[in-house]
């Protein structure tokens, strides 16, 4: 089971936030995450794994402040220890930065690059945020593998279409260049012929 929430800011469209029911489900979330996903977890404490799905083309720096705080509050609220504390640090990083090795426990992860891990601090619990998110909560039993494959398939098709469009434009540019070269060549030829014609005319002039 995966829990889904909706978050939005004044200046952006809605974002999807999701988290697994337990550490075993987290394994599938880690395995079938998307490149657009940002992973959240309470720093140095046990907590839920919360993911934010960015819009295509966005980066971690583009996360609206309100949406960032929604994710941070949600992960804090789903930490047995963190939910009782103030000034809790929450780490977040792109899904692609998560590292999972065979010797790690269920639900445990590391990072490929520590420099890509960011921190946001939740000073204290804000019920207004949690209540608003709770109203958007949905429970689903998704086929994460199938959804990931569908997403990857669409991306492959988009890239294929982009390559085809690029080739079409290159072909069009080459055609235009060839036509311009032919036109210039024809113009030069006409110029030479005109000059020859004028010279022939001058040679035959007779002055009385």
UniProtKB/Swiss-Prot annotation:
Disordered: region residues: 145-208
Keywords: Acetylation, Cell membrane, Coiled coil, DNA-binding, Membrane, Phosphoprotein, Transmembrane, Transmembrane helix
Annotated segments matching region DNA-binding: 21-25
InterPro entries: Jlp2/Ccd25, NFACT_RNA-bd
Biological process, per Gene Ontology: positive regulation of cell motility
Sequence ranges on the Cytoplasmic membrane side: 123-208
Similarity comment: Belongs to the CCDC25 family.
Biological function: Transmembrane receptor that senses neutrophil extracellular traps (NETs) and triggers the ILK-PARVB pathway to enhance cell motility. NETs are mainly composed of DNA fibers and are released by neutrophils to bind pathogens during inflammation. Formation of NETs is also associated with cancer metastasis, NET-DNA acting as a chemotactic factor to attract cancer cells. Specifically binds NETs on its extracellular region, in particular the 8-OHdG-enriched DNA present in NETs, and recruits ILK, initiating the ILK-PARVB cascade to induce cytoskeleton rearrangement and directional migration of cells.
Quaternary structure and interacting proteins, as annotated: Interacts (via cytoplasmic region) with ILK.
Protein's name according to its UniProt entry: Coiled-coil domain-containing protein 25
Native species: Bos taurus
Upper lineage: Eukaryota, Metazoa, Chordata, Craniata, Vertebrata
Gene this protein is translated from: CCDC25
């Amino acid at each position: 089971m995966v829990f889904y929430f909706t978050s939005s800011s004044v200046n952006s469209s809605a974002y999807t936030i999701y988290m697994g029911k337990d550490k075993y489900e987290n394994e599938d979330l880690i395995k079938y995450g998307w490149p657009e996903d940002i992973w959240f977890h309470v720093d140095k404490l046990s907590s839920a794994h919360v993911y934010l799905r960015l819009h295509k083309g966005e980066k971690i720096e583009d996360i609206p402040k309100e949406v960032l705080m929604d994710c941070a509050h949600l992960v804090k609220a789903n930490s047995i220890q963190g939910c009782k504390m103030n000034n809790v640090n929450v780490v977040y990083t792109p899904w692609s930065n998560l590292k999972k090795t065979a010797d790690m426990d269920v639900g445990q992860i590391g990072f490929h690059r520590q420099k890509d891990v960011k921190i946001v601090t939740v000073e204290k619990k804000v019920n207004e945020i949690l209540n608003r998110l709770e109203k958007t909560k949905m429970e689903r039993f998704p086929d994460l593998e199938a959804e990931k494959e569908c997403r990857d398939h669409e991306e492959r098709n988009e890239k294929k279409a982009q390559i085809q469009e690029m080739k079409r434009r290159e072909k069009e540019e080459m055609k235009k260049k060839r036509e311009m070269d032919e036109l210039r060549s024809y113009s030069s030829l006409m110029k030479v012929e005109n000059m020859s014609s004028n010279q022939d005319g001058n040679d035959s002039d007779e002055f009385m």
